[in-house]
Amino acid sequence: MTRNGLSHAQDDLWPAPFRHGSPVSGTVAVPGSKSLTNRYLVLAALASEPSLVRRPLHSRDSALMVAALQTLGAAVTPLPDPGPFGPDLRIDPVRRSAPAADPVRIDCGLAGTVMRFVPPLAALHTGQVDFDGDDAARVRPMGPVLDGLRQLGVHVVDQGRAALPFRVLGTGSVPGGTVTIDASGSSQFVSALLLAAVRFDSPLVLRHDAPGGVPSLPHVEMTLQVLRDAGVDARRVDERSWRVVPGDVAGLDVTVEPDLSNAGPFLAAAVATGGTVSIPDWPQHTTQGGDHWRHILPRFGADVTLREGVFTVTGPRELRGVDLDLSEAGELAPTVAALCALASGPSRLRGIAHLRGHETDRLAALSTELNGLGGAVTETLDGLAIEPTALHGGVFHTYQDHRMATAGAILGLRVPGVQVADIATTAKTLPEFPRMWAELVGSEG
């Protein structure tokens, strides 16, 4: 895999703290879920009255979402007395009968939720909305969302790219109806249309029609649950179709759960070193894919408990290899792969072919960078095969991918001399990561 766009990487190397064989232990409070934060923000912008989102994630992805919604006419106001990870937010929704507006531009950055969730909202806007983002975002697939909008009668201009940049010419309304898309590349294609459907003129029936299922299905269930909690008639019709009935959405007053996917690197620190790490405020029931940590980490030999909202992981003396289907929680794969590279036995990660279309081609990136540290990793049709081998230090490139950066940090706990290029890319979903990591594991590289 080539390292395009990484000419600056050698100038920004972060020495990953090395633990010299000592266990990592501590308690880590994790900021709010990115997936929930951005869903709540979108729904609040579509509501009929102001909303309050408590303990939202403040990161590049959520800031891009806030800016996009403000561009379309919502007002987002930080409230006083911020907590440890930033202020609560008041959202005044987009006016429904706004007059035609001058052309506007939305910067998606590298945020999948922005580039996919906001175009259907732009169709409800009156006027021209241009979308673009980072260079790396221009290779992320957008076809199913744009195709779905066209089926609904929305005028979309993309010069046949099915990717950024593109233009949506909104008329202020979308009729609704039945839409069929190929959602095998991302569950976000489904969530994008379901969220906006609360403001369509008639019900939306959305069908996935392609070989194979929809990856990361818990994220679709998360979208449905967020809609239902707001009083919307939203449901799964069958394994491949969903239905949303439009209607007024009351103002939200919600508290965002901690981001359980972002809890992963801190839990992995305990697993990799035989320590004990606790995450407070872990929900008993959740639609977050990160809740799979409760089932994944014991496969490596770790002990896990969830008592009174505190999830605690104690690592084993020796990491076992694993054989895991991660189709429902692909965002956990970089952290899991880092642990597999430290395990004493072979591992196989399956069901994650769709990661080739994430912030980077994560399968190619993981195999390239792990092998660059002496690993024995092979890409398979739908995942990775990882053999045990002795690793050595070196530069771990991140490809502007936040989860690649945290994977490199995990490896550095056990492998001296690992240098992570562009640790600042963690600002995408966890700006505080370098500080939080140093507080938990120490700062010695």
Swiss-Prot record:
Belongs to the EPSP synthase family. It is an enzyme of class 2 (transferase). It comes from the Bacteria. Disulfide bonds: none annotated. This is 3-phosphoshikimate 1-carboxyvinyltransferase. Monomer. 3-phosphoshikimate binds at residues 34-35, 39, 186-188, 216, 331, 358. Keywords: Amino-acid biosynthesis, Aromatic amino acid biosynthesis, Cytoplasm, Transferase. The gene is aroA. GO terms for cellular component: cytoplasm. The lineage of its organism: Bacteria, Bacillati, Actinomycetota, Actinomycetes, Micrococcales. SUPFAM superfamilies: EPT/RTPC-like.
